[in-house]
Structure formats: structure tokens, C-alpha cells
């Protein structure tokens, strides 16, 4: 994990500013909010004239549920009298996404009237294939027997973007149990920054 990764600079731009800059370019987005408990991120948001939602500490840990933070944001905004048809989440850890990806996501959601639309990329391996589990005694066992999977219909979920409605998010215990659609994004634009290696890779890809 990377400490304070959202404000780490990649090619002299804070990671979260890549998302701020993109969101401001998309005309279909009426209002932009950032949910955070960080004063530094709030200051960056203010410089971009972006609204902020103060996220509770209990929803700001590395193990916190993203969905719970969505619910908190929606409830907060509704109490403030905000009304909106769609809820679009653009996690700051995907700086390589572009306008085309997000416009496709919005169009897919509005066209097919699903409960949720997500972004995916083609998987590069079959789950559990060549994966092992290390037992307490230090010995290795195959994680699970190979199942009848095919790469053709298997995809990895990305953090490029998610879109739903406030109503669906608030009522759902598991958002994937509804009608879920997806759009395919290229793997090079689906990088999710989680560690130092990801930061180095993003730096190289963003220079292209």
C-alpha cells in the first residue's frame, strides 16, 4: 500500500488531480464531489472549485467498503437538498482512464436501463489456475481444482468507473445482485494504483 497515494505526484501532478481534471471535461457531469477525510485533498479540491464531502474516519480506512462511502455521500447530499438522477463514481486510483471510457459507460447505463454499469478489461488468466495456497505448516496446495472456465467470457472488474442511481445504491446490500451491464476498456487504461510498482508504471504510461 502507498501512504497518502491520492496526493502523490505522478509526472508533477497529484494522483487525484488526474480524476478532477477529467471529470471537469465531461459535459454530462453536472456536479462534482470528492468524498475524503484528508485536509490536503480538500485543499486540492477547492483549488479546482470542486465540492467536498467530509468522509467519516470509519469509512476512510484501507479496508473500508467503497459502497458504504457511496451511501454516506448520497445521504449527505440528499440532506443538503441535492437531487440527481445518476451516481457516477470515478475512483482516483485510475489516472489513465479517458473521456471516451466514461462517456461509453454513461451511454451504456442510460441506454440499457440497468441497475449498475461497470468497467471491465479482458482477464489474462483463469481464476485459480496456477494458483496455490500456503498452509500453516508451510506446505503448498493447489488453491482449487480447475473448473470449466474459459477466458472468452471472463473479465476483470476495473476501477475506471461505476454508474448507478442513488435509489439503487441506497437499497442494495450487494450491488452486483441486480441487473449489471459493463463496458470494455483497454488494459493499459485500467491500471489501478495500489502500490509503488503501480505508481512507477503509471508514470511511464502517462508519459506516452
Where are these regions (language model features)?
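Histidine-centered beta-alpha loop that forms part of the nucleotide-sugar donor binding/catalytic region
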Residues: 57, 91, 121-122
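N-terminal glycine-rich phosphate-binding loop and ensuing alpha1 helix
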Residues: 1-36
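Short, high-confidence coil segments that cap the C-terminus of an alpha-helix
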Residues: 29, 82-84, 113-115
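Short phosphate-binding loop-to-helix
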Residues: 33, 39-88, 96-104
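Hydrophobic helical membrane-anchoring modules
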Residues: 182-184, 188-208
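Conserved core of the sugar-phosphate nucleotidyltransferase
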Residues: 68, 95-185
Amino acid at each position: 500500500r502507498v501512504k497518502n497515494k491520492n496526493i502523490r505526484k505522478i509526472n508533477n501532478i497529484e494522483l487525484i488531480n488526474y480524476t478532477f481534471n477529467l471529470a471537469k471535461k465531461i459535459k454530462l457531469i453536472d456536479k462534482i464531489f470528492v468524498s475524503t477525510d484528508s485536509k490536503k485533498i480538500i485543499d486540492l479540491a477547492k483549488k479546482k472549485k470542486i465540492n467536498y464531502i467530509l468522509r467519516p474516519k470509519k469509512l476512510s480506512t484501507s479496508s473500508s467498503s467503497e459502497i458504504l462511502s457511496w451511501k454516506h455521500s448520497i445521504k449527505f447530499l440528499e440532506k443538503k437538498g441535492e437531487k440527481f438522477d445518476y451516481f457516477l463514481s470515478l475512483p482516483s486510483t485510475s489516472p489513465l482512464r479517458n473521456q471516451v471510457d466514461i462517456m461509453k459507460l454513461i451511454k451504456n447505463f442510460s441506454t440499457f436501463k440497468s441497475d449498475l454499469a461497470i468497467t471491465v478489461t479482458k482477464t489474462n488468466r483463469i481464476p485459480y489456475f496456477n494458483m496455490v495456497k500456503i498452509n500453516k505448516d508451510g506446505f503448498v496446495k493447489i488453491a482449487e481444482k480447475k473448473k470449466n472456465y474459459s477466458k472468452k467470457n471472463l473479465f476483470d472488474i476495473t476501477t475506471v468507473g461505476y454508474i448507478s442511481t442513488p435509489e439503487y445504491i441506497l437499497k442494495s446490500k450487494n450491488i452486483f445482485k441486480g441487473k449489471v451491464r459493463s463496458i470494455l476498456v483497454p488494459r493499459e487504461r485500467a491500471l489501478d494504483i495500489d502500490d509503488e510498482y503501480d505508481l512507477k508504471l503509471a508514470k511511464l504510461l502517462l508519459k506516452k
